[in-house]
Amino acid sequence: MAKLTKRQKAIASKIEAGKSYNFVDAAALLTELSTVKFSESVDVAVNLGVDPRKSDQVVRSATVLPHGTGKTVRVAVFTQGPAAEAALAAGADRVGMDDLAAEMKAGDLNYDVVIASPDAMRVVGQLGQVLGPRGLMPNPKVGTVTPDVANAVKNAKAGQVRYRTDKNGIIHTSVGKVGFDAVKLKENVEALIADLKRIKPASSKGIYVKRITLSTTMGPGLVIDQGSLEA
């Protein structure tokens, strides 16, 4: 068995095995345990009572967190005409059509979100092999294919998170940064859980939100007592 590092021993000494933590206490403990020199993300994993092998139980959506994620989000938009002007005014980092597609094919993919108006999908459709593997392909299910590109840009910049159940029925997303006020982190997670409940598949039976785990980029995962959340 590999030996634990000093940092791992210090972390292990402060975590109670099998405990479900009050959310605010968990956020405070994760901040205390963060010793890295960069601003770690605070992430949440939510185990859902779904069978992701069934297409009608794949949970996929997007929601704007009330306090954002603390990340700077670069947004590219495929559109033209007045919509292009509106997207730029809303804060898009790059707007274009065939010219933008050519840049992306050449390897310029320094974007976190790609948005497209429906009329631009003839161009975006050529980029499936480029954008798909990076999770950047616009999709109407998460609001990135829309006639209202300006609003989509505002949402992305405001801290919208996009999520989808993995093969184990778990969704993973960032909900802030270490150093965020614990109450703001809590409200972000509550907004996410409320959105998950809103789109609960009708065919999902039994307990829907089974487990919520909070962690940092380099830190441990703490199971959250769902009774400490208002969602």
UniProtKB/Swiss-Prot annotation:
Superkingdom field: Bacteria
Xref: SUPFAM superfamilies: Ribosomal protein L1 (SSF56808)
Keywords: Repressor, Ribonucleoprotein, Ribosomal protein, RNA-binding, rRNA-binding, Translation regulation, tRNA-binding
Matching InterPro entries: Ribosom_uL1_bac-type (IPR005878), Ribosomal_uL1 (IPR002143), Ribosomal_uL1-like (IPR023674), Ribosomal_uL1/biogenesis (IPR028364), Ribosomal_uL1_3-a/b-sand (IPR016095), Ribosomal_uL1_CS (IPR023673)
GO MF terms, alphabetically ordered: rRNA binding; structural constituent of ribosome; tRNA binding
GO annotation terms (biological process): regulation of translation; translation
Family annotation (PANTHER family): 54S RIBOSOMAL PROTEIN L1, MITOCHONDRIAL, LARGE RIBOSOMAL SUBUNIT PROTEIN UL1M
Cross-referenced HAMAP family: Ribosomal_uL1_B (MF_01318_B)
Function according to Swiss-Prot or TrEMBL: Binds directly to 23S rRNA. The L1 stalk is quite mobile in the ribosome, and is involved in E site tRNA release. Protein L1 is also a translational repressor protein, it controls the translation of the L11 operon by binding to its mRNA.
Subunit architecture: Part of the 50S ribosomal subunit.
Similarity-based family: Belongs to the universal ribosomal protein uL1 family.
Name assigned to this protein: Large ribosomal subunit protein uL1
Organism: Pseudomonas savastanoi pv. phaseolicola (strain 1448A / Race 6)
Gene name per UniProt: rplA
